[in-house]
Amino acid sequence: MTTNTVSRKVAWLRVVTLAVAAFIFNTTEFVPVGLLSDIAQSFHMQTAQVGIMLTIYAWVVALMSLPFMLMTSQVERRKLLICLFVVFIASHVLSFLSWSFTVLVISRIGVAFAHAIFWSITASLAIRMAPAGKRAQALSLIATGTALAMVLGLPLGRIVGQYFGWRMTFFAIGIGALITLLCLIKLLPLLPSEHSGSLKSLPLLFRRPALMSIYLLTVVVVTAHYTAYSYIEPFVQNIAGFSANFATALLLLLGGAGIIGSVIFGKLGNQYASALVSTAIALLLVCLALLLPAANSEIHLGVLSIFWGIAMMIIGLGMQVKVLALAPDATDVAMALFSGIFNIGIGAGALVGNQVSLHWSMSMIGYVGTVPAFAALIWSIIIFRRWPVTLEEQTQ
């Protein structure tokens, strides 16, 4: 009896440590959103010019997720996690030391390499290490780590950047990663590769129209979100005319609302996943359309950010759950593709926001984001009517 209790505790401790790792990886991806103005000032650049760093990072992840996953498909997972954390930590040290914007971008590419592998294996590892009958809760913990990156990681990173300089933000993330690495070394057993798939899995996955439709929906809706979200910090300060402290509070509010979205999806996702995702996309569309009109009031922007955060968390969870349900025989390949496609959307959205800000007006980022958001809404309605059972019932 005691052995079972201890083993369950250890199993949960392993999953929690993975969730902390997810928090750290997501924090470092999102945190530049809150530091763009400071980094731009440091290198005497325009904020929109620095924003291209977001696109480069995201597209490196998109490009390398599948190749790296296939290259490491037979590598024992504990060893793989240790190696990618070493690369992650070293890259953050370089970010801290970066003496030019080019060096900063190079350091971020190193982080992106580690990111590409991490997110292709994390969901399946959490499921493997979860106590018996607790797979859904394990995935929920990983999702919570992701949500907390928005709730705590991004705002805390911005606060550290405001008071101690943006370099210290990256250094602090590196220290957090080092502590997490030591915990992983202590806790994780040997984890031989399982269900990782191979190149042979790709034609099989590509022949699943429901899965391909989810991938397409993902890239379009993420593009819509990041067209505006990538530049929300300079938008709040330069377009709305509010303080840097309010920009920090708004990021905290938007991220915190994601936890509400996670709770809603946790309660209703099993029965109404498709309806929830479509409703969330419609809510995102409304938020983007109202971004500029809401910029005349801190209260209006605050309320809008709550609904925006709820919508994006439901969308993100819904997409991940459906991908895992539609590819149980090749989870690592499917999640590597998902991570790559998600990051194509991040990069595309950041690039669109960059071009709108440079060549038109940053005030228009919300309106421009409504175009892919509307397309995503129509596509979600079409595919969820076309495959209502396939998407909902394969988890049973």
From Swiss-Prot:
Residues annotated as transmembrane: 15-35, 50-70, 81-101, 103-123, 136-156, 170-190, 209-229, 246-266, 275-295, 299-319, 333-353, 364-384
Protein name as it appears in the record: Probable sugar efflux transporter
Listed GO CC annotations: plasma membrane
Subcellular location: Cell inner membrane
Source organism: Escherichia coli O157:H7
A Pfam family matched in the record: MFS_1
InterPro entries: MFS, MFS_dom, MFS_Efflux_Transporters, MFS_trans_sf, Sugar_effux_transptr_put
Homology family: Belongs to the major facilitator superfamily. SotB (TC 2.A.1.2) family.
Periplasmic side: 36-49, 102, 157-169, 230-245, 296-298, 354-363
Family matches, as CDD domains: MFS_NepI_like (cd17324)
GO molecular function, one term: carbohydrate transmembrane transporter activity
Cytoplasmic side: 1-14, 71-80, 124-135, 191-208, 267-274, 320-332, 385-396
Keywords linked to the UniProt accession: Cell inner membrane, Cell membrane, Membrane, Sugar transport, Transmembrane, Transmembrane helix, Transport
Topology in the lipid bilayer: Multi-pass membrane protein
Biological role stated in the UniProt entry: Involved in the efflux of sugars. The physiological role may be the reduction of the intracellular concentration of toxic sugars or sugar metabolites.
